[in-house]
């Protein structure tokens, strides 16, 4: 029995227990991981699918808008002199516009101060106005009675009214120069002063300015105007019009324009108001682009891609999704439907055709020709209750509505993920219980091994102590 061994005591079975627990949970863990990954991928794809549909809906809404087909464009022959825009109410036509003078704003230079570094104005009040608009009164005291202090106080008071002040130094000294953004007759800057006669070494009254009597600025220290506020003048098709602002919106019905410079005598600007054919084309192109984006996304998410002979093919996240197939069939059906009530019967008449992958392509020359030759027909094809944009939009709506098809699919997938989380938690509890059970059992086994080892040693020791156990003869 000296050579008999029945096991080794105090064995650590931790690694064995972990392997047994992992083996027990491996299949279910892999199953849940695969389900979670697939579901998450589908959820992401559905979100992107909804976004692509929404972008297509936006393009359809724009194309179905009367504003697109009723829009007018205004083009100037020289935008450095005149730039214009037009609303739907503008009538197509051509206008000859001569800019005789621009509307001007008031700019004045107050009396020069010979020694600005040492000048301290008397206490008092400045009241500045631009036409009928009065600025907040400025109180002059020791906190602001320098030239720089006056500048800052005027800028603060004139912020809302568009009046600003700066300091310019010339041969006569330094002076405040005030500017206004308001143009037109009667918008001159006026400065009224109430001088207390004390508190400084310089009369506050020197800052007074009356546009009614002030001369044009010239050499010397006296105040004067740099520019007077005055109306401008334009001539439209030979009709003269005085303008108080260089932004004009009340001369030609539905047309607004900004005049920037005076035209040369006898060289008027040509302003052309017409349909916005380019805007219509742009919206048709956006419709095609949005449709193609949606179609390409569907193609990518419903395809099976081979990745090698020894590997499983990669399938799109929405492969086999009935809602996707239904949408594709619906869109294609509407695109090939003929408009029996209009001169434009189908997309092909606009130079828009379907390619092999289901996307659309545009023959821009044919589209330009269709818009130019049959503008009303193009508008009728896309707009109204029976127009393509409305029909397609109605087909998209059930997919993107709140609690619609895609929301329901999303809710179902979210429930699946929630269920996966529940199963993962349950599996974790079950495996923890199994680990605890196995640990207990193997601890008992280890204790039994220890006991058997002790007994084996005791027997061996006893046998060795016997006379014949030592090898001696008796």
From Swiss-Prot:
Record has Acyltransferase as a keyword: no
Keyword Lipid metabolism assigned: no
Compartments in which it is found: Secreted; Bacterial flagellum
Gene Ontology process terms (BP): bacterial-type flagellum-dependent cell motility; cell adhesion
Keywords: Bacterial flagellum, Coiled coil, Secreted
InterPro entries: Flagellin_hook_IN_motif, FliD, FliD_C, FliD_N
Coiled coil: 408-454
GO CC, any one term: bacterial-type flagellum filament cap
Major site of localization recorded for this protein: secreted
Quaternary structure annotation from Swiss-Prot or TrEMBL: Homopentamer.
Recorded family membership: Belongs to the FliD family.
Described purpose of this protein according to its UniProt entry: Required for the morphogenesis and for the elongation of the flagellar filament by facilitating polymerization of the flagellin monomers at the tip of growing filament. Forms a capping structure, which prevents flagellin subunits (transported through the central channel of the flagellum) from leaking out without polymerization at the distal end. Essential for motility. Responsible for adhesion to mucin, which is the initial event in colonization by this organism of the airways of cystic fibrosis patients.
Descriptive protein name: B-type flagellar hook-associated protein 2
Protein's organism: Pseudomonas aeruginosa (strain ATCC 15692 / DSM 22644 / CIP 104116 / JCM 14847 / LMG 12228 / 1C / PRS 101 / PAO1)
Gene designation per UniProt: fliD
């Amino acid at each position: 029995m000296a050579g008999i061994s029945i096991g080794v005591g105090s064995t650590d079975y931790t690694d064995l227990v972990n392997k047994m627990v992992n083996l027990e949970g491996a299949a279910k863990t892999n199953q849940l991981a695969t389900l979670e990954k697939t579901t998450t991928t589908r959820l992401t794809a559905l979100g992107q699918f909804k976004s692509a549909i929404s972008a297509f809906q936006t393009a359809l809404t724009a194309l179905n808008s009367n504003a697109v087909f009723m829009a007018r464009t205004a083009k100037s022959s020289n935008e450095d002199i005149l730039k214009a825009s037009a609303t739907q109410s503008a009538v197509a036509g051509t206008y000859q516009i001569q800019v005789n003078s621009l509307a001007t704003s008031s700019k004045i230079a107050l009396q020069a101060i010979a020694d600005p570094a040492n000048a301290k104005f008397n206490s008092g009040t400045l009241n500045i106005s631009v036409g009928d608009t009065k600025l907040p009164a400025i109180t002059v005291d020791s906190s602001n009675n320098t030239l720089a202090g006056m500048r800052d106080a005027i800028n603060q008071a004139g912020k809302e009214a568009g009046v600003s002040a700066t300091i310019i130094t010339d041969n006569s000294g330094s002076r405040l120069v005030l500017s206004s953004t308001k143009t037109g007759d009667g918008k001159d800057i006026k400065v009224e002063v109430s001088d207390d006669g004390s508190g400084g070494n310089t009369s506050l009254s020197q800052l007074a300015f009356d546009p009614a009597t002030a001369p044009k600025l010239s050499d010397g220290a006296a105040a004067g105007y740099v520019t007077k506020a005055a109306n401008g003048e334009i001539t439209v098709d030979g009709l003269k019009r005085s303008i108080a602002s260089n932004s004009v919106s009340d001369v030609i019905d539905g047309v607004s324009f900004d005049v920037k410079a005076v035209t040369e005598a006898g060289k008027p600007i040509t302003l052309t108001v017409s349909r916005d054919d380019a805007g219509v084309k742009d919206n048709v192109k956006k419709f095609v682009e949005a449709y193609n984006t949606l179609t390409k996304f569907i193609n990518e998410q419903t395809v099976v891609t081979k990745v090698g002979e020894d590997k499983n093919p990669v399938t799109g996240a929405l492969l086999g999704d009935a809602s996707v197939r239904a949408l594709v069939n619906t869109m294609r059906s509407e695109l090939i439907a003929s408009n029996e009530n209009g001169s434009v019967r189908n997309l092909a008449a606009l130079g828009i055709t379907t390619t092999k992958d289901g996307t659309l392509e545009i023959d821009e020359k044919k589209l330009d020709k269709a818009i130019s030759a049959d503008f009303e027909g193009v508008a009728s094809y896309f707009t109204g209750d029976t127009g393509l944009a409305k029909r397609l939009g109605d087909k998209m709506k059930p997919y993107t509505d709140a609690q619609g098809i895609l929301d329901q699919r999303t809710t179902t997938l979210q429930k699946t993920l929630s269920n996966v989380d529940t199963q993962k938690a349950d599996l974790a509890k079950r495996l923890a219980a199994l680990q605890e059970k196995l640990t207990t059992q193997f601890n008992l086994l280890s204790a039994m091994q220890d006991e058997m080892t002790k007994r084996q040693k005791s027997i061996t020791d006893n046998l060795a102590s016997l006379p014949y156990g030592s090898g001696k003869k008796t």
